[in-house]
């Protein structure tokens, strides 16, 4: 089966694993998925990310994070720019997710950045997803 939107699949797998409180999630690797996972780790939404190399495409292992009482750290993930409808943001119109409580993941000429980093570097790009 050919997957038309591997980023949406990745976000859905994280959302589903988070809903049933799995500790670890494994997905097929790609550069953009690695970048998204690293941003989630850097921003404190997941505990850790491991990239396991094999002879094929590799695997990304994401360790999900929960609060003291088992509450989810990731409330939701939403795919914004889709293959059928791309969404771009200029450097002056960078989106804010829940007034700064969440993050927007932006694909820029300088790589994958959060909305805050894109504002600091004064670059625009494709709005990949919102995480809060």
Curated annotation (Swiss-Prot):
The keyword Transcription regulation does not apply. Pfam families: Ribosomal_S8. Gene3D superfamilies: 3.30.1370.30, 3.30.1490.10. GO terms for cellular component: ribonucleoprotein complex; ribosome. The keyword Electron transport does not apply. It comes from the Bacteria. One of its GO terms (biological process) is translation. One of the primary rRNA binding proteins, it binds directly to 16S rRNA central domain where it helps coordinate assembly of the platform of the 30S subunit. Belongs to the universal ribosomal protein uS8 family. NCBIfam families: PRK00136.1. This is Small ribosomal subunit protein uS8. It comes from Streptococcus pyogenes serotype M1. The gene is rpsH.
